[in-house]
């Protein structure tokens, strides 16, 4: 199709869709394909992707399977969590935050292998196409991006399978029928969308949940844990130091056991439509609650409230694919500055779908028991001072009232 494209780096999972894309690139563009498979903690065995790529003629040296779990949590998830980011107040951005890292590595591999373009398997209806491509262009403005779902005429699962069989691409038997929903997973979350979930009135069937037990079936006894923070990032669980990815994985196990982190959500996509998704973020939900807990005693009121005002914009930037944009980096600098004293320990109670902060302590705590006590404060606070404070703040309200407004 294009003489200018000789080699393409494909974000490759080894599944049916990206295997069809791999062959389609070879047939349509007549180009060499380099495959890249990211291990983001999705819990799948990734070596079959290597075997399948080799079966489809990819040179061993052009098959990249990279373990990005630590980088993902350290450089993407934790910075986002410092902001307490939740898109539209609920969504912990598990899919959104993974895309810039995948794009970053795609662009790096393209540079390493001398590729002319990168390709992804995101559809033309969703947000991921935007996230992949905005990130790629931010890192390399001259990169070419191929989005097969916007180019080919394969408009159904049946057509995809027929094309695969025509080109001798192995089709697993469980892929011949329509899947009742589609999923995306990484160390932070699992998302499920489509088919059985498209009616927002219908409750999500139990079989959709893969990462958490039903809260009703969770243990009848609560479990208490502690998370240690240093400068806004988690560093230990129950007193045991852990790397970022190891900590999140351990929290995932706890969250799964106690049915924590389920979210049934109708959200506003960047491309303009509403979509219904079911998210499971067990460890991320625990971590987010804990981070809020340690901030509650270490952040000044003004800083805390300003962070809360900035958070929706920060979350929207990530959701819409602007991780590498200057405005996100500006907000990140402010957020990171706020975390200088966000150090200490949070105790949480895990019980039947809930992660409740029940204790917090910090060497930088701004909480003064002496000032808030209901007992004798030994002169720490003169309650008579409140009268002047109220009088000044009431002045404008009195003036408005006297004008009948």
Curated annotation (Swiss-Prot):
GO terms for biological process: argininosuccinate metabolic process; L-arginine biosynthetic process; urea cycle. This is Argininosuccinate synthase. ATP binds at residues 11-19, 38, 121. Belongs to the argininosuccinate synthase family. Type 1 subfamily. The keyword Ligase applies. The keyword tRNA processing does not apply. Its EC number is 6.3.4.5. Keywords: Amino-acid biosynthesis, Arginine biosynthesis, ATP-binding, Cytoplasm, Ligase, Nucleotide-binding. It is found in: Cytoplasm. L-citrulline binds at residues 91, 96, 127, 131, 182, 191, 267, 279. Pfam families: Arginosuc_syn_C (PF20979), Arginosuc_synth (PF00764).
